[in-house]
Amino acid sequence: MNKQSEKLAKAIAYEAKKKKERDEDKRPAFHVTPTTGWCNDPNGFSRFGEEYHLFYQYYPYENKWGPMHWGHCRTKDFIKWEELPCALAPDMEYDGQGCFSGTAVEHEGKHILMYTSVLEKDLEDGTHMVRQTQSIAIGDGENYEKVTENPVITADCLPEGSSPVDFRDPKIWKEDGRFYALIGSKAEDGSGQLALFTSEDALHWNYEKMIDQCKNRYGKMWECPDFFALDGCQVLIVSPQFMRAEGLEFHNGNNSIYFTGDYEKETMTYTRGDARQVDYGMDFYAPQTVETTD
């Protein structure tokens, strides 16, 4: 997969130029940092082959937020990280305003990235349209190509009242021969909810149900969900916007919280307990987990 759009080629060339100019002695020795420019959410944290890949929200051209790309690096030991070329650029109509957050999974020797594609445009009636959809790119660990089926999931299949503007951050995983995706959504009252989808091929998806709804109990929009089994429990991590403080908890506004609960796979039913903070710092948001070989 060596196809590169003009925007992606431009980003990769800019990275190469800035790498020659930067002072390596001033870069962190262990922490992942962008090749150049801006980064925020970690994306696509996953095992592929014998290595672990980490992508991130990325704007290479300035030290501030801009149209989101996906930066890329990999490691074998989580100490030494190898920088790789920019993996995704906002180069299609459906993602022209950004390749927002997402996750990744290995399948049959290929690395599948699932991300939120953002479209904005002015309509003939004078209104401004924003749409967040979900898209797929498939690669070999270094080069990735967006599929012709994109966007593979839109908000059209969601329950009435669900926002097509706030529909993002897919968590993709594979289990028992099927693909699953858990995606953040906003209900009509502005509260967060999590939509569950299934697929046989990661390209054609079926909406199953809202697996959880916060009903304004824990903030508003739930961003960047993570969902995994741990020590006999099913853990759900979300990053709610506009959390209200409760006693000594949730004082950082936009938090990352986790629930432990039970998940019934046959009925796709999740029963959760109370929320706990993942971290009490002011700058901790949108974490991702990966299952290692040990």
Where are each of the predicted segments found?
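Beta-rich carbohydrate-recognition and catalytic domains
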Residues: M1-D169, K174-G219, A229-G281, D294
